[in-house]
From Swiss-Prot:
Organism: Mycobacterium marinum
Name the record gives this protein: Probable hydrogen peroxide-inducible genes activator
Residue span(s) of domain HTH lysR-type: 8-65
InterPro entries membership: LysR_subst-bd, Tscrpt_reg_HTH_LysR, WH-like_DNA-bd_sf, WH_DNA-bd_sf
Functional description taken from the UniProt entry: Required for the induction the katG gene for catalase. Involved in the response to hydrogen peroxide.
GO CC annotations on file: protein-DNA complex
Swiss-Prot/TrEMBL keywords: Activator, DNA-binding, Transcription, Transcription regulation
Similarity field: Belongs to the LysR transcriptional regulatory family.
Length: 311
């Protein structure tokens, strides 16, 4: 009778499966990369632990006993499960060879995400990216709670326990109603915003805070328009309709200008702008993987957008 407390070893199960499939001890040993004596000892230990004969040995061939034939599918399933576990663990050890939960803010996603995903697909074909678009604060909370792996946001995040990895910087461009006299001008002083109705995004969008910071840093008290938008695309369409002006990042210019008739003006130096980069948990132990991820993103974005890569 088999002792139910007995726990077969993986070596014993592999030996049994190999012998059953090869029907030859020498061939089975070669398949496992062990000596024939090691194989025989592992199989003998399994049979002793089970108190069963699993194979009939002869000088030329190996035959399975009735018990061996009955237990073989279970042994094969156990070996396959361990191999699947090992493969999955190897994927977890390399976060860029599996699945990654990637957050991105709404004022970045529509303009760089297609380029980023194409670059990742080309350079990391085994990586599956799950994209979560949300406002900065909610992405940072998700990171700290472990429901996100990394996020592409405007820096600095200034969040305890998170590591920041800058990727690129870009200028802000002033979007104006069609036919505005400032359209196509360069060297526009930030102080000019004091004379223009400034459209802002809703609370929670980092671009709203950045626009207000631009005014504050320049000592300008902006005239805020009554209209607010939930997205940059809506803000630009409001500008297109003559409801005010707004700041848009350089990466958004080609997309937003193409679907509207807004005028564009460029600020005088030092040009206001923003820095975009990856953030992730400092405790993740994935610094090298995320450095590689950031490098691929930077290369992809730099090839398509008028931004300044941060080394």
């Amino acid at each position: 009778m088999t002792d139910k407390s007995y726990q077969p070893t993986l070596a014993g199960l592999r030996a049994f499966v190999a012998v059953a499939e090869k029907q030859h001890f020498g061939s089975a040993a070669n398949a496992l990369g062990v000596s024939q004596s090691t194989l025989s000892q592992a199989l003998a230990a399994l049979e002793a632990g089970l108190n069963l004969h699993l194979v009939e040995r002869s000088t030329r061939r190996v035959f399975l006993t009735t018990e061996g034939r009955s237990l073989l599918p279970h042994a094969q399933a156990a070996v396959e499960a361990v191999e699947a576990f090992t493969t999955a663990a190897a994927g977890e050890a390399d976060p860029l060879n599996g699945s990654i939960r990637f957050g991105i803010i709404p004022t970045v996603a529509p303009y760089v995400l297609p380029t980023v995903l194409a670059g990742l697909t080309r350079r990391l074909p085994t990586l599956t990216v799950r994209v979560i678009e949300d406002q900065t604060e909610r992405l940072l909370t998700a990171l700290r709670e472990g429901s996100l792996d990394t996020a592409l946001i405007a820096l600095p995040a200034d969040y305890r326990g998170l590591t920041e990895m800058p990727i690129y910087e870009e200028d802000f461009v002033l979007a104006l109603p069609p036919g505005h006299p400032m359209a196509d001008r360069h060297g526009v002083p930030v102080a000019a915003l004091s004379e223009l109705p400034l459209l802002l995004l809703d609370e929670g969008h980092c671009l709203r805070d950045q626009a207000l910071d631009v005014c504050q840093n320049a000592g300008v008290r902006a005239e805020l328009a009554d209209t607010r938008a939930a997205s940059l695309a809506t803000a630009v369409q409001c500008v297109n309709g003559g409801l005010g002006v707004t700041l848009i990042p350089q990466s958004a210019v080609s997309v937003e200008a193409a679907r509207s008739r807004v005028g564009l003006a460029h600020f005088a130096a030092p040009t206001p702008g923003r820095r975009i980069g990856l953030v992730y948990r400092a405790s993740s132990g994935r610094d090298e993987a995320y450095r590689q991820l950031a490098a691929i993103m930077g290369e992809s974005i730099g090839n398509e957008q008028q931004v300044r890569l941060v080394n």
